[in-house]
Amino acid sequence: MNTRLLARGVATLALTAGLGLAGSVAVDADTTPTPASQTIGLTALKAACNVAVQRRLGTLAADATFVKDSAALTGSDRTILEGQISADQVGLPALDRTIQGDTTGKQAWTDCQMIVTGYRVYVLEDPKIHEVIAADGVTKVDETFATLIPELQSLINNSSVSATVKAEAQADLVDLTSKVDASQTSISGVASSVINLTPAGWPGNAVQLTSAAQNIKTARTDLAGAGADANHIIQLLGA
């Protein structure tokens, strides 16, 4: 195994682990998607509701592509997320058809609220998708580090550098191992804690999203440090 290339590859992965989280931004308020009060006309209300549905379908389409193309996701998590996205892609157009068939402003308004309350695309579904991808990405990097650590130890043991340099490299490896262990602790259970959150649990389940985001951030920080340690070991040993 080319330890130098592996170490540098892992260092790069460590910096990008959880990149999916960058897309996790709530871009829509947790309110009705209509632009005005219940006093607007029925036709205008239906049009506004349709726009709200189409916007969410656009977001879900992007999420579906992200999930399909992600190299970080586990097979089981990918399957679960694809099923959830597909259900929303079926449910939202069906809801829109109901709204377009409503004959009173009151009924259309009531049904329109379901675009938000029944799906929570922007405050729950989209963020949790990105968090699951990010968490799985961190886990994958942790696993790669587990392969790298004994390789680096062997490299240190067999190196012809001075005892002082070898001791410095060993200290880096101890720090690297500690950071990877911390990352594993932070990320443990994160994906499973959010993947099955539902709109019905909002806003109570917002705390899980917040906690997951913080754990991912902490784990990514540890991995970035571990990646720096790996690169420094390689530099010290001239490998």
How should each PLM-predicted stretch be described?
Residues 1-11:
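Bacterial N-terminal signal peptides that target proteins for export
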Residues 12-20:
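Bacterial N-terminal signal peptides
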Residues 3, 17, 29-30, 47:
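Cytosol-facing boundaries of transmembrane alpha helices in integral membrane proteins
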Residues 64-108, 157-218:
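Amphipathic, non-membrane alpha-helical rod segments
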Residues 20-43:
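C-terminal region of N-terminal signal peptides and the immediate post-cleavage residues
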Residues 1, 27-29, 62, 221:
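Intrinsic-disorder/low-complexity regions
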Residues 35-60, 105-156, 179-239:
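C-terminal amphipathic alpha-helix
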